[in-house]
Amino acid sequence: FHAVMADERTIRFIIASGEKLSVSEEYDNDIVNKFEVRKLIHKVVFDNSNKDIVETLRLIELLSTHNYILQTMLHRIELAIAVEIKYCSLTKYSPTFLEKPFELTINNEKITCKELESGKVIEKQLGSTYNIPNIKFVGFIDRVDTLGQNIVVIDYKSSQTDFSLESLELGFISQILTYSLACEMLFNKKTEDILGIFYREIARIGK
C-alpha cells in the first residue's frame, strides 16, 4: 500500500485528478471509473522496481488463490486513490512526500533533527538547560500534505486497536507529536502552521 501510494506517478495523478473533480458527492467507484484509476495502478504495480512491490507480487504468485488476492488488493488501492482524489479536491491539500526517515535527538539544551536521506541537520535551542539524559527518536514520517504555508502530518494506522483518544491524552501515543516537531524543524515552520492528524485504518480500506 505505502509503496504504491508513495510512487511519484500516483502522487501526480492524485493532484491532477483532484484539480479536475468538481462534484464532491461523487461515489468512490464513480471516481475510479471517471479517471480510469485501474490503468494507473497497473502501471505503478507492474512497471516498478520498488523492492516492496516486487516482493509482494512474488509472494502472492505462490498462493493458490493468487488471482483473487491480487484483484482484491488492486481494488482496495483503487478505492484508496479515489478517496485521496476527493480529499485533494475538497481540501486543496496536496500530498508532498511519503515515508521520510528522520532522527530526532533531545538533550539538556537543544533539539537536533536529522533528515536521514539527505543528511541535513537542524538544531533548535531550548532556551533553558534541563537535567535530562539524551533522548533519541528514529522513525518515518508516513506522509506530509501541503497547502501554502500550512502542512498536515499524517500517521497511517493499521488497526482499530492501536489508537484511541484516551491513549493520546494520557501520553501513551507520541508518534504524531514527534513527527510534527520533526516537520517543524525540517521545513522551518511555526507550530501553528502544522496540523497533526491520524489517518484512516489502511487495513480496512475497501471493506
Region annotations inferred by a language model:
Residues 3-118, 125:
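A non-catalytic, helix-rich entry segment at domain boundaries
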Residues 1-4, 197:
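Short alpha-helical scaffolding segments that buttress acidic/His motifs in well-ordered protein cores
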Residues 1-2, 77, 143, 179:
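Short conserved aromatic/hydrophobic patches within beta-strands of well-structured domains
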Residues 110-207:
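Mg2+/Mn2+-dependent nuclease catalytic core
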